[in-house]
Amino acid sequence: MSSAVVPADDILEPTLQNILDQKSLRWIFVGGKGGVGKTTTSCSLAIQLAKVRKSVLLISTDPAHNLSDAFGQKFGKEARLIDGFDNLSAMEIDPSASMQDLMAAGGDQAEDMGFGLGGMMQDLAFSIPGVDEAMSFAEVLKQVKSLSYEVIVFDTAPTGHTLRFLQFPTVLEKGLAKLSQLSSQFGPMLNSVLGARGGLPGGQNLDDVLSKMESLRETISEVNTQFKNADLTTFVCVCIAEFLSLYETERMIQELTSYHIDTHAIVVNQLLFPGKDSTCDQCKARRKMQKKYLNEIEELYEDFNVVRMPLLVEEVRGKEKLERFSDMLVHPYQPPQE
């Protein structure tokens, strides 16, 4: 465990060491409001995990794709090793990409997922709200599962997109269940119509397609179950000590709880620690405001590991700076005396 001294009143350790120690974790999501240091935190956590795990994959699901900027290295849809590491890889994907893009890029792989539906069935499938994005998410999960990494860290999009991203498995399950119900009611008629029009691509019939979709539903159901298992999945909230960020964090934690997704760690970034002899009035005023919201965080989340990270004088970009920042996730920053 960390060398930090834990107070005698059993306040939880102000580090992410417990996440590193939890060897059963398979999925780790890092999320928060835009501009709070979410990508820096996810990169830093992945670096720490790479010290204790055989293989780590860092995935950006944020359309802004800041991983490339953080490490100074270009990443894309295929996982590639991060320079200077032999067990830490990264990739940048967009789970909200249209299914048309996926089908154009996926070829046979898309067929295997059950996407060879033909125009009519595509229209039927995508008439269900959220299924377009959920199918894209399914493709992402299939890629990730096939890569066999020991632990996967998701650098998620800003708060609203994060929560929608985590709903995808449930949305897809409901959508496929609805399609299955429709097929049982209208299957014979649809088969007749499709037969008259030359059938589905590859000589498939409707039953073949629905069988593939049922297989897909089972895969998504399995992942959904894993997401709700605290031994396998956790969510790290990132915020700053300001009202709007704290409000977003509380809303996010409530929603995560409603999805039965574990969350027990909060990283508070960009904290000011002016020395007692500081002549910076703005720094002192901001520190006073931050202390107010830090106190609220400690009261609201007394059963969370709350990590306090300082505002640095330089951007945290590049391997060396990220490694220094990541060290403070497990060895708490010691501020000067105020």
Curated annotation (Swiss-Prot):
This entry carries the following GO cellular component terms, namely:
GET complex
> Is-annotated flag, keyword Transferase?
no
List the CDD domains hit by this protein, alphabetically: ArsA (cd02035)
Per the UniProt entry, what are the Gene Ontology biological process annotations, in alphabetical order?
cellular response to oxidative stress; pheromone-dependent signal transduction involved in conjugation with cellular fusion; post-translational protein targeting to endoplasmic reticulum membrane; response to heat; response to metal ion; retrograde vesicle-mediated transport, Golgi to endoplasmic reticulum; tail-anchored membrane protein insertion into ER membrane
Q: Which GO terms describe its molecular function?
A: ATP binding; ATP hydrolysis activity; guanyl-nucleotide exchange factor activity; identical protein binding; metal ion binding; protein folding chaperone; unfolded protein binding
Where Zn(2+) is bound, by residue? 280, 283
Query: Per its UniProt record, what InterPro entries does this chain match?
Result: Anion-transp_ATPase-like_dom (IPR025723), ATPase_ArsA/GET3 (IPR016300), ATPase_ArsA/GET3_euk (IPR027542), P-loop_NTPase (IPR027417)
The membrane-spanning stretches of this chain are none
| Keyword Nuclease attached | no
What EC number(s) does this enzyme carry? 3.6.-.-
Sites binding ATP sit at 33-40, 242, 269
Q: Which UniProt keywords apply?
A: ATP-binding, Cytoplasm, Endoplasmic reticulum, Hydrolase, Metal-binding, Nucleotide-binding, Transport, Zinc
Location(s) in or outside the cell:
Cytoplasm; Endoplasmic reticulum
Q: Which domain of life is it from?
A: Eukaryota
| Active site positions, chain numbering | 62
At the top of the EC hierarchy, this enzyme's class is hydrolase
Summarizing the function annotation, the protein's role is: ATPase required for the post-translational delivery of tail-anchored (TA) proteins to the endoplasmic reticulum. Recognizes and selectively binds the transmembrane domain of TA proteins in the cytosol. This complex then targets to the endoplasmic reticulum by membrane-bound receptors, where the tail-anchored protein is released for insertion. This process is regulated by ATP binding and hydrolysis. ATP binding drives the homodimer towards the closed dimer state, facilitating recognition of newly synthesized TA membrane proteins. ATP hydrolysis is required for insertion.
Q: How does it assemble?
A: Homodimer.
Q: Which HAMAP family match?
A: Asna1_Get3
Q: Which family does this protein fall into?
A: Belongs to the arsA ATPase family.
The protein's name: ATPase GET3
Question: What organism, scientifically named, is this protein from?
Answer: Uncinocarpus reesii (strain UAMH 1704)
Q: Which gene encodes it?
A: GET3
